[in-house]
Amino acid sequence: MWRGTLKIIFINRRKVGIIVILLGLMITLVGISEQFDDKLKTTILVENNINLLDDYTGLDGKISYKLPEGWTTREKKFPGGEIIYHNDFQSSDAVIHGFVEVWNSKEDLKIFLENSKKISQGQNIIKNYKMDSIIINGKKTYLVHYLINVTNNNWYKAYEYFIADNGQFYRISFFTRDVNFKEAYGAIFESIIDTFNVN
C-alpha cells in the first residue's frame, strides 16, 4: 500500500498578480526604449542637417551601407590582397572624414586590435584609448575610440568599428578634429553603422 505524503502548495494570488504586472511593465519599457532610441537617432541626424542617406555597396554587393547625402566618397585599391575594399568618405562641411574597409585576415580580431594598438602607440601620441565590445545588427563589434596627435598638438578624435566575419573583418572609421567634435557625433556614427550589412 502506498504511503506517500501529500504536499499542498498555496499560491498567493496577490503576489502572482504583482509579478505578472511587473513583467508586463518591463516588457513594455524595453519596447518603448527601443522606439525612443530610434527616434532619438533620427532627431540627431535631422538636427545636424542630415536628412537623407545615400546607399553604397561594395565587393559586388557583398556589403552595403549608407552615408549622409552630400558626403563625398572615393574608392581606393591596395596591393597585396589584405585590404580588399576601401572607400574614403568626407562630410560636406569637411569636419568628419573616414573610411569603410574589408580586410582578409585569419587572425583573431581582438588580438589584431591589441597588436595594432601597440604599433600605433609606438608611432603616434595616443590618449584616452578605449575598446568596447558591442552588438551591431546582431554581430559582435569592437568600438575603439581614442585621441591621436597628428601634428603639433593637432588632436583628432577617432571612432573605429570592427566586425569579424569568417576570415574577414569590416572596419568603419570616423575621424574629426577634437576641437570640432560634438557629443552628437557619436550617435551619428552609430546611426551610420546601423545601416552596415553583410549580404
Language-model regions, residue ranges each:
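N-terminal targeting sequences that direct proteins away from the cytosol to non-cytosolic compartments
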Residues: 1-89, 154, 175-199
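Conserved polar/disulfide-associated segments of primarily extracytoplasmic proteins
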Residues: 2, 7-11, 77-165, 169-171
